[in-house]
Swiss-Prot record:
PANTHER family: V-TYPE PROTON ATPASE SUBUNIT G (PTHR12713:SF11), VACUOLAR ATP SYNTHASE SUBUNIT G (PTHR12713). Subunit of the V1 complex of vacuolar(H+)-ATPase (V-ATPase), a multisubunit enzyme composed of a peripheral complex (V1) that hydrolyzes ATP and a membrane integral complex (V0) that translocates protons. V-ATPase is responsible for acidifying and maintaining the pH of intracellular compartments and in some cell types, is targeted to the plasma membrane, where it is responsible for acidifying the extracellular environment. In enterocytes, acts as part of a pHCl-2 sensory pathway which mediates Tor-dependent larval growth and metabolism in response to zinc availability. Gene3D superfamilies: 1.20.5.2950. Keywords: Hydrogen ion transport, Ion transport, Transport. One of its GO terms (cellular component) is presynapse. This is V-type proton ATPase subunit G. The keyword Cell inner membrane does not apply.
Length: 117
């Protein structure tokens, strides 16, 4: 009986040791997965920063700075408004005279669709 108890104890000890090894292997696997995930995240972030930097360079090269674009738009608007003001000043008096002629020179006529019965 003592040999059976000793055999059972050895089996229990072996089972416990195997469970510890399995648990340790799971922990190592979890650590490796976490490390791989961290490395992948870091690599993705580096790639994203590199692409962002390349895009900023491309944008600066082809579009100029935003302030420069805004200044150019403002200058274009000022030029167009000045042109409109000049056009208004040159055409205002003849236009007003033409409108006044229509108002003052009324020639009453019977409408062509009017039927007098």
């Amino acid at each position: 009986m003592a040999s059976q108890t000793q055999g059972i104890q050895q089996l229990l000890a072996a089972e416990k040791k195997a469970a510890e090894k399995v648990a340790e292997a799971r922990k190592r696997k979890a650590r490796r997965l976490k490390q791989a995930k961290d490395e992948a995240t870091e690599e993705i972030e580096k790639f994203r920063q590199e692409r962002e930097r390349a895009f900023k360079e491309f944008e600066a090269k082809h579009m100029g700075s935003r302030e420069g674009v805004a200044a150019k738009i403002d200058a274009d608007i000022r030029v167009k408004l000045a042109d409109m003001d000049r056009a208004i000043q040159t055409r205002k008096d003849p236009f007003i005279l033409e409108i006044l002629q229509y108002v003052y020179n009324i020639s009453p006529e019977v409408h062509k669709n009017y039927n007098h019965k």
